[in-house]
Every structure is written in C-alpha cells, then in structure tokens.
Regions:
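Residue-level signal for inorganic ion chemistry
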Residues: 16, 47, 81, 184, ...
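Short amphipathic alpha-helical segments
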Residues: 28-30, 92-96, 142-144
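A general structural motif
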Residues: 35-40, 60-66, 108-117
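Short beta-strand segments
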Residues: 16-19, 82-83, 111, 131-132
Length: 239
C-alpha cells in the first residue's frame, strides 16, 4: 500500500585502526623489537571483500591522552573498528580512552578461545568494535561477530552464518569450559583440522591453511575422528 518494492541498503562508513608503540607500517622498516601492522590491512581486505567501505585511520600510540584525542576525531564514522589495546596489560589504554569519550559498553570479553579480548558498545552515534591485537584472533572475530553485525547494520537481509555438516578426519583436543574456535579445511564433505589444533594466537599461517571454522560447545573437551561436525565455511553465502 506504500508502493515500496524493495528497501535500499544503507552504505555505512567504517574506520579501521590499530594501537601499539611496537607497530610499524608495511612500508616502514621494523627492528627486532617491533612488528608490522598487518591487522588493519587484513581487516580492511576482509571488509572490502564483503562489500563494505572501510577507511584506514592509522595507529594510536600506547598513550592515554593521545588515545582519547584520536578516538574523539573518529566520531564522524558509523562504525569504528580497532585492534589491540583492550587486554589487561599496563599499556592497554583503549577501553579507558573510549570510556572517556562516552562509550556505553555492551560487553567486554567473550568466553571464546581464541578471541576472548573483544569489546563492543555505542559512542554517540558510532558503533565501536575493539578486537584483539593478535592477528589470528582478530581475523576470527571479524568473521564470527563483526561481518554479520555489519551486514545487518547495512540493511542486508542475509546476515546469519551458513553452516555445513562434515565428517571430522582426525581426533583432537579442545579446552573444556570455553567455546573453542577450531580452524581447518573442508574438502569433499570432510573436515581436516589445521595443525592438530595446536597454534598460537599470532600464527597467521594457520589462517592461510584454513577455509573453515568449527565452533564447539563450552562443554566439549575433544572431537573424535569420524564424528559429524557443524562447520562455518568462510566462503559460504550468508542467510
């Protein structure tokens, strides 16, 4: 009756940044004590692949006052995505800096391994998403939490993860009491766990070897060979 045929999707503006004095840009030279800022560019690549408009806004140093000022300059964006600075380290100022800018925290931390340090909330009209600093956990959280949320925020109808069923090909252990995120490859209906589920939170090679994620229940302590499992295909269409 309103003569509306189709709702238009809304293009949202997204700011992406990292934090840490130890970070160097890919075009800069890093010492043995420094690391390259791969998170921001990996996050932007993931978002661009999914059709989002993301802008790189730089690196915030580990300084509270500078963090507060930097964050205040980002309030023009619909979404602000950061990586690093939200753990319990002495130099992790991001949470406090956002709070000083009026952030209303929805949650801080999830019972997930890897990927526990994550914070989301609302700051004025901006949605704030703070991801872990470790590359593997940041990219896992982008796929699990962020992309579906952004799809919904942008007005898309399909934003739920699409799961497939596969047969696990080798047994491996998981941590009881936590929801475990297990990387692997799905091929011809079979799931092959990556590196026996033994890799660190900063090992981006595990991501390169994987095309899917197995999400366990918190009560699970091991996955048996030939067990049927539900898999999140990283290339699957959203529903």
């Amino acid at each position: 009756s309103l003569n509306i045929i189709k709702m238009a999707n809304v293009s949202i503006s997204i700011a992406v940044l990292s934090t840490g004095n130890e970070l160097k840009e890919p075009w800069q030279k890093a010492s043995n004590e420094e690391i390259y800022n791969c998170n921001s560019f990996a996050i932007i690549a993931q978002l661009n692949e999914k059709g989002f408009n993301a802008t790189y806004c730089g690196v915030i140093p580990d300084n509270l006052e500078k963090s507060i000022d930097f964050i205040n300059s980002l309030k023009k964006y619909d979404v602000i995505i950061t990586s690093g600075g939200i753990s319990m380290g002495d130099a992790d100022f991001m949470a406090e800096a956002f709070l000083k800018n009026g952030l209303e925290v929805a949650f801080h931390g999830v019972n997930v391994k890897p990927g526990r340090p994550i914070m989301m909330g609302k700051m004025d009209s901006s949605l704030v998403i703070c991801l872990p600093g470790n590359p593997l956990t940041a990219m896992v959280n982008i796929n699990l939490f962020v992309i579906p949320m952004l799809k919904k925020l942008q007005g898309e109808n399909a934003f739920y993860h699409g799961y497939i069923k596969a047969i696990n090909q080798s047994s491996f252990k998981t941590i009881n009491g936590r929801v475990n995120i297990v990387l692997g490859r799905v091929q011809n209906g079979n799931f092959y766990v990556t590196d026996e589920n033994k890799y660190g939170a900063g090992m981006i090679t595990a991501l390169y070897k994987s095309n899917s994620i197995l999400v366990t229940n918190a009560s699970t302590s091991n996955i048996e060979s030939t067990q049927e499992v539900k898999i999140l295909d990283l290339n699957v269409i959203y529903f």
